[in-house]
UniProtKB/Swiss-Prot annotation:
Pfam families xrefs: RNA_pol_Rpb1_1, RNA_pol_Rpb1_2, RNA_pol_Rpb1_3, RNA_pol_Rpb1_4, RNA_pol_Rpb1_5
Single biological process term from Gene Ontology: DNA-templated transcription
InterPro entries tied to this protein: DNA-dir_RpoC_beta_prime, DNA-dir_RpoC_beta_prime_bact, RNA_pol_asu, RNA_pol_N, RNA_pol_Rpb1_1, RNA_pol_Rpb1_3, RNA_pol_Rpb1_3_sf, RNA_pol_Rpb1_4
Protein's organism: Staphylococcus aureus (strain USA300)
UniProtKB keywords: DNA-directed RNA polymerase, Magnesium, Metal-binding, Nucleotidyltransferase, Transcription, Transferase, Zinc
Cofactor binding remark: Binds 1 Mg(2+) ion per subunit. Binds 2 Zn(2+) ions per subunit.
Name recorded for this polypeptide: DNA-directed RNA polymerase subunit beta'
GO molecular function, one term: zinc ion binding
Subunit structure: The RNAP catalytic core consists of 2 alpha, 1 beta, 1 beta' and 1 omega subunit. When a sigma factor is associated with the core the holoenzyme is formed, which can initiate transcription.
Gene behind this protein: rpoC
Entries under SUPFAM superfamilies matching the protein: beta and beta-prime subunits of DNA dependent RNA-polymerase
EC number: 2.7.7.6
Length: 1207
């Protein structure tokens, strides 16, 4: 066997007949498979043991030689070599064809390679190959052109006139003769000359032909090899034949296809030996050609060959294609051993790095480890005995299992794995029952809930794999989301509610204003019921020992609440005491107004003070997230995950104590709701009157009515929120961010509002009832449209989103950080992204975590804030924006010069860790997942709103697909191709509008449809590429008008626009990586003196290399223009044919690669997965291959012996 990690590239080409014979271990002469009585393979048949090797290990067919000691012997009776039966997976056979046969891929594919090479139309080729016409191979004195087609009658006429003086043939033989006669060098010269003179269609045809001729010439493939004389037969184990229970046989379709070929081939041989009439031989040759076509690609030409039940047979091509093909089914993803799956349940008592594994499952997964340990401890005598102990589940087995799984992480995965947080590592603990226990905080990353979701468990086996799982994949290490660098493990639902309830303050709480010496007294008082969680109290500030308190503050009393004292115990000591949910309090210090000088208090003491003070807002979900981010910024990951665990315990404990429930009585209906509705009803009447008088159009009336009712709902919502009691459980749930929002609440207690019809149009009759009052039948019926649409949308769009992610990953999978600094001299100018006046993405977010490309001075003090190639940290970013600077040049993936992938400096910091990115990080895949994963949210957003009108987005996912596929957008904007001034805007014919732009040397007029809104005015100066009407720009056109940089920025802005409108934050750098992949190619306009072909797509780096070479030798360089490719096209145009073939259009990619003799240097991830090498990213990179793993760390259990949450 080859060592997979030891080869550097893979090459593909056409096989010559000699090559095919050299692979083969013998010719298959008979169509038989196995003998129906003995069930042994027939000699010389498709499963013959003499050709393909023995069916049983170390045993010949007739049984004369058995056992290993005869290894390598060839039996004198049956001729079978004694060896392992595994050779039947790798030994090939062959068929010697009685007549040459064309290979359907090269004759039928688009464009037909054979046709281009011979300069014949595919139809002419088909007529010759399938014996409908003769082709002239050698015209002799006939005056015919070479390659002319002759019908049967014409051929006879000529044959009678010039017997034996000219040659015309039918079938693949004629084509083969023509192909053998081609002189590639001569052809090349002729074509190059033709390029100089030709125009139009002749030019395009010449370029296509040139490409094929060049391919053959450079690859060393001979054109005649497209015609087969010998057919290889793949090894029998790959097209098996197995016996089913009932004694019948199931066989791979390939065997049927091979049998047809062999039968027809043998018949043809016999006919030729007998000297049968020409017409019969011809018919047989045609049938042989068709049989070989069906074997290689069934259904490509004519009707496919069908098996029993009219099912088309799967040919060799089908074995590679599609989701069930070899590439995607067996090479890119395999089923693995040491894995299990089960339903998940919540494990509130787990630590951040733990999961609960059901005992039986753990025993099965760790079976070999347990067996080894049992034998080592001498509990079992041998492996067999250990195995039976495990199967009996003896008591001692469990103790050993506990020992084995300690410190052995397992991977948990939930499908669909949309981003890298869909697989994380945990340390298993054994649990009773049959459900996997999952830590509640990681559910967000997995997008899991406990309504029946299932998860898969995998065991990393080798020491290196375990080390990687522990260091890189442990859940406690993955706190940040790679798409925006924000914490992904924020508490949710009960945990939020518990902490919210804990930090709530109430006016009427028992013993308000009590003063305590220290926190212990407070906790004792709370335990005894002297104070409530919500009681506002005072505590001597000095007892906190808080380093952020000033001396002055330490002499005073801190006014706070009992709950907040409990909450602050989980916060690290060096933090300010958190008394109000503000960034000021969190990042700097506790505000001074909460420190009260006891001497200034009046008669009523602190109680009187509290009566005059407003209540402080409790801590909601967003603020908890901010706390986590702040702790993460200041401390290690370990401290953060400890705090998260404490926050989780606190949340669960107090949400249980709060006992928050929802009852019908909690839904308070608004008293003056009817009055609001009546007012708006009057407004609608007025609009209807105006319409009836003909003052407004139908469209205006409809829009006005919809606006009136939307306003009514907003008003009711506003008043509801005002009138609500702050301790109302539903309000608490929505206010804390645990579940639900204002809109849900309005539907329960106010009115449901407007609904959308199935078409997506809003029905102007609103639902005035709320769920509390109950809906009328009509209202209920209208409601169902929205709900149904929500469900249908989700189902359809989830698939779309998954497919988008797949295409994105495919186009960017070879973008890996490959060097520290590419040394580019260009930068990207960034500023706020705005749409009109609306902010889409602020400047500060765009520069943070990137490297600067210029020196930035403070405009007033002139001090240097940052120098080129320095990382912009959050502090520096704040300094830059505070100094009033609104734009700057930064390093960007757009301007990176790295040949493959990007460099560290152009990428910036790694968002998943918050550190600088390291060489080997697979940033392309991360970018693709970061853009693809929220795609599902874009889609699912419609579903969660319960089908209320207005929240369903049309611009979401379809717009993202439109951008990345570089399609012509719907609602296209008109752009100007010249710089100048808008001279005139007038009506043109067919109700169109005409915009005239006058430039320095020319005047252009642009037509816009009558309905589109024009956004320029007469006399307004416009730049090249500026938008004249509202709408989306067609990116390909924009590229040629406005240039590369403008197009990159435009695509970036458009993608950000869609996501930010949905409230999804994605870092720019991910979009940059993707857009860069779409702009990797240029189209050659003139080839100059280089070897490039005009009109061909070439990688930018190859283009610059060719030109550099030309300049060196004082030759004419080539010229080219940048091309924007959609992601699907870009994936198929990648340098690696393995990656492209496994993506889409497998046969086309492989045909092309074989003719060009392409070599795949295995630079991307996919290619290496396919051939089974370590991927060249992360620890699989060459530079890390000598890193060894050793164990030095203390067990985690010791690190974790920390104080638990205060009771």
């Amino acid at each position: 066997m080859i060592d997979v990690n030891n080869f550097h590239y893979m090459k593909i080409g056409l096989a010559s007949p000699e090559k095919i014979r050299s692979w083969s271990f013998g010719e298959v002469k008979k169509p038989e498979t196995i003998n129906y009585r003995t069930l042994k393979p027939e000699k010389d048949g498709l499963f013959c043991e003499r050709i393909f090797g023995p069916t049983k290990d170390w045993e010949c067919s007739c049984g004369k030689y058995k056992r290993v000691r005869y290894k390598g012997m060839v039996c004198d009776r049956c001729g079978v070599e004694v060896t392992k039966s595994k050779v039947r997976r790798e030994r090939m056979g062959h068929i010697e064809l009685a007549a040459p046969v064309s290979h359907i891929w090269y004759f039928k594919g688009i464009p037909s390679r054979m046709g281009l090479l011979l300069d014949m139309s595919p139809r002419a080729l088909e007529e010759v190959i399938y014996f409908a016409s003769y082709v002239v191979v050698d015209p002799g004195p006939t005056g015919l052109e070479k390659k002319t087609l002759l019908s049967e009658a014409e051929f006879r006429d000529y044959y009678d006139k010039y017997p034996g003086q000219f040659v015309a043939k039918m079938g693949a033989e004629g084509i083969k003769d023509l192909l053998e006669e081609i002189d590639l060098d001569e052809e090349l010269k002729l074509l190059r000359d033709e390029l100089e003179s030709a125009t139009g269609q002749r030019l395009t045809r010449a370029i296509k032909r040139l490409e094929v001729v060049e391919s053959f010439r450079n690859s060393g493939n001979k054109p005649s090899w497209m015609i087969l004389d010998v057919l290889p037969i793949i090894p029998p184990e790959i097209r098996p034949m197995v016996q089913l229970d009932g004694g019948r046989f199931a066989t791979s379709d390939l065997n049927d296809l091979y049998r047809r070929v062999i039968n027809r081939n043998n018949r043809l041989k016999r006919l030729l030996d007998l000297g049968a009439p020409g017409i019969i031989v011809q018919n047989e040759k045609r049938m042989l050609q068709e049989a070989v076509d069906a074997l290689i690609d069934n259904g490509r030409r004519g009707r496919p060959v069908t098996g029993p039940g009219n099912r088309p047979l799967k040919s060799l091509s089908h074995m590679l294609k599609g989701k069930q093909g070899r590439f995607r089914q067996n090479l890119l993803g395999k089923r693995v051993d040491y894995s299990g799956r089960s339903v998940i349940a919540v494990g509130p008592s787990l630590k951040m790095y733990q999961c609960g594994l059901p005992k039986e499952m753990a025993l099965e997964l760790f079976k070999p480890f347990v067996m080894k340990e049992l034998v080592q401890r001498e509990i079992a005598t041998n492996i067999k005995n250990a195995k039976s102990k495990i199967e009996r589940m003896d008591d001692e087995v469990w103790d050993v299992l506990e020992e084995v799984i300690r410190e052995h992480p397992v991977l948990l995965n939930r499908a669909p794995t949309l981003h890298r947080l869909g697989i994380q590592a945990f340390e298993p603990t054994l649990v009773e029952g049959r459900a996997i226990r999952l830590h509640p905080l990681v559910t967000t990353a997995y997008n899991a809930d406990f309504d029946g979701d299932q998860m898969a468990v995998h065991v990393p086996l080798s020491k290196e794999a375990q080390a990687e799982a522990r260091m890189l994949m442990l859940a406690a290490q993955n706190i940040l989301n790679p798409k925006d660098g924000k914490p992904v493990v924020t508490p949710s639902q009960d945990m939020v509610l518990g902490n919210y309830y804990l930090t709530l303050e109430r006016k009427d709480a028992v013993n308000t204003g009590a003063i305590f010496n220290n926190t212990n007294e407070v906790l004792k008082a709370y335990a005894n019921g002297f104070v409530h969680l919500h009681t506002r109290i005072g505590v001597h500030a000095s007892s906190f020992n808080n380093p952020t308190f000033t001396e002055e503050q330490n002499k005073k009393i801190l006014a706070t609440s009992v709950g907040k004292i409990i909450f602050n115990e989980i916060i690290p000591d060096s933090f300010a005491y958190i008394n109000e949910p503000t960034q000021e309090n969190l990042e700097r210090k506790t505000p001074n107004r909460y420190f009260i000088d006891p001497t200034t208090l009046g008669e009523g003491g602190l109680k009187e003070y509290f009566e005059n003070e407003e209540l402080i807002e409790p801590f909601n979900k967003k603020f908890l997230g901010n706390i986590i981010a702040e702790v993460f910024n200041r401390f290690s990951i370990t401290d953060t995950s400890m705090m998260l665990d404490r926050m989780k315990d606190l949340g669960f404990k107090f949400s249980s104590k709060a006992g928050i429930t929802v009852g019908v009585a909690d839904i308070v209906v608004l008293p003056d709701k009817q009055q609001i509705l009546d007012e708006h009803e009057k407004l609608v009447d007025r609009i209807t009157k105006q319409f009836n008088r003909g003052l407004i159009t139908e469209e205006e009336r409809y829009n006005a009515v919809v606006e009136i009712w939307t306003d009514a709902k907003d008003q009711i919502q506003g008043e509801l929120m005002q009138s609500l009691d702050k301790t109302n459980p539903i309000f608490m749930m929505s206010d804390s961010g645990a579940r639900g929002n204002a809109s849900n609440f309005t539907q329960l207690a106010g009115m449901r509002g407007l609904m959308a019809a199935p078409s997506g149009k809003i029905i102007e009759l609103p639902i005035t009832s709320s769920f509390r009052e109950g809906l009328t039948v009509l209202e209920y019926f209208i409601s169902t449209h929205g709900a149904r649409k929500g469900l249908a949308d989700t189902a359809l769009k989830t698939a779309d989103s998954g497919y988008l992610t797949r295409r994105l990953v495919d186009v960017a999978q070879d973008v890996i950080v490959r060097e520290e600094d590419c040394g580019t001299d260009r930068g990207l100018l960034v500023s706020d992204i705005k749409e009109g006046t609306e902010m889409i993405e602020p400047f500060i977010e765009r520069i943070e975590g990137r490297y600067s490309k210029e020196t930035i001075h403070h405009p007033e003090t002139d001090e240097i804030i940052i120098r080129p190639d320095e990382l912009i940290t959050p502090e520096i970013a704040k300094k830059i924006t505070d100094a009033g600077i609104e734009q700057m040049y930064i390093r960007s993936a757009f301007t990176c010069n790295a040949r493959h992938g990007v460099c560290e400096k152009c990428y910036g910091k790694n968002l998943a860790t918050g550190e600088k990115v390291e060489v080997g990080e697979a940033v392309g895949t991360i970018a693709a997942q970061s853009i693809g994963e929220p795609g599902t949210q874009l889609t699912m957003r419609t579903f969660h709103t319960g089908g209320v009108a207005g929240s369903d987005i049309t611009q979401g996912l379809p717009r993202i697909q439109e951008i990345f596929e570089a399609r012509n957008p719907k609602g296209q904007a008109v752009i100007t191709e010249i710089e100048g001034v808008v001279e005139d805007i007038k009506l043109a014919k067919d109700r169109q509008q005409e915009i005239v732009v006058k430039g320095a040397n020319e005047t252009r007029s642009y037509l816009a449809s009558g309905t589109s809104r024009i956004i320029v005015e007469i006399g307004q100066p416009v730049q090249r590429g500026e938008v004249l009407t509202e709408g989306s720009i067609e990116p390909k056109n924009y590229l040629s008008v406005a240039g590369l940089n403008a197009t990159e920025s435009y695509l970036l802005k458009e993608v950000q626009k869609v996501y930010r409108m949905q409230g999804v934050e994605i870092d720019d750098k991910h979009v940059e990586v993707m857009v860069r992949q779409m702009l990797r190619k240029v189209r050659i306009i003139e080839a100059g003196d280089t070897k490039l072909l005009p009109g061909s797509l070439v990688d930018i780096h190859n283009f610059t290399d060719a030109n550099r070479e030309a300049f060196k030798h004082r030759k004419r360089p080539a010229t080219a223009k940048p091309v924007l490719l959609g992601i699907t096209k870009a994936s198929l145009e990648t340098e690696s044919f393995l990656s492209a073939a496994s993506f889409q259009e497998t046969t086309r990619v492989l045909t092309d690669a074989a003719i060009k003799g392409k070599r795949d240097d295995l630079l991307g991830l996919k290619e290496n997965v396919i051939i089974g090498k370590l991927i060249p990213a992360g620890t699989g990179m060459r530079r890390y291959s000598d890193v060894k793993y050793e164990k030095t760390a203390k067990p985690v259990a010791e690190v974790e012996s920390q104080t638990e949450v205060t009771e």
